[in-house]
């Protein structure tokens, strides 16, 4: 999502929300959980407002964009709650943009700490137009084929969490950064160009304007109901192994939040058993609580999609440390500086 779009969303939110008061909580969030009607966010936000009387002021943008906005507002924070994905949540923590807060659900959530907590499980995925392509690209090398020239697009590393995940997945699949950047340099010949948001690529694939794009499992499964030509795939490495980077939605309380107590209430609400039980039903995500296992068809479909695909994750703190240098190198090899 472009910064101008983020600004427009912010203006809309401020114009449509009540005057600044104790009955408001402001959320800066990565896209994906508010897609479509009756989304998980929408249902939980409505339930939260009904239970507490606290209105949600919602601003949406790319995973890196929302953190950049927090950083710019450091001296005058406007948000109470941040939802983004790795490695941007680690960057926010390192830049001291997050406040200490242990959630009520911390003991039931692996990887939760005093600065942030996983909110919804999710994984990097890729999508293709199944009407125009008889089969999905089988491997990373297949994506270099000339038939994908100007028919392939992935969101921009450093701006979009899913785009950053593509770069990290390449590191994993190719076994080294050098090999990965060499590949991504070649892939650029087919790449349409930059995209600050991943979510909008699905419609382009569905219409056939492009054949292949990146995404994430939760968002793509939710979008497929409205985009019938889209199917999910994972390209294999040279050993024939398919793998998917785990990129959960992660939530944290903003340092200096104007309505900190309301932010804490919302975070605890979204991590409650009741809310977590419905994340697959409403938005195709997977709950992060170890004591919640949904039985709905969406949850079954999400777990089935991952069969034969190995999930993995790096040391996110290490990723955050080298991210700026890696993004700079990506711009250099793709000649997109």
UniProtKB/Swiss-Prot annotation:
<dbReference type="InterPro" id="IPR017637">
    <property type="entry name" value="AminoethylPonate_ABC-bd"/>
</dbReference>
<protein>
    <recommendedName>
        <fullName>Putative 2-aminoethylphosphonate-binding periplasmic protein</fullName>
    </recommendedName>
</protein>
<dbReference type="GO" id="GO:0030976">
    <property type="term" value="F:thiamine pyrophosphate binding"/>
</dbReference>
<keyword id="KW-0813">Transport</keyword>
<dbReference type="GO" id="GO:0015888">
    <property type="term" value="P:thiamine transport"/>
</dbReference>
<feature type="signal peptide">
    <location>
        <begin position="1"/>
        <end position="21"/>
    </location>
</feature>
<comment type="similarity">
    <text>Belongs to the bacterial solute-binding protein 1 family.</text>
</comment>
<dbReference type="InterPro" id="IPR006059">
    <property type="entry name" value="SBP"/>
</dbReference>
<comment type="function">
    <text>Probably part of the PhnSTUV complex (TC 3.A.1.11.5) involved in 2-aminoethylphosphonate import.</text>
</comment>
<dbReference type="GO" id="GO:0030975">
    <property type="term" value="F:thiamine binding"/>
</dbReference>
<keyword id="KW-0574">Periplasm</keyword>
<dbReference type="GO" id="GO:0030288">
    <property type="term" value="C:outer membrane-bounded periplasmic space"/>
</dbReference>
<keyword id="KW-0732">Signal</keyword>
<dbReference type="Pfam" id="PF01547">
    <property type="entry name" value="SBP_bac_1"/>
</dbReference>
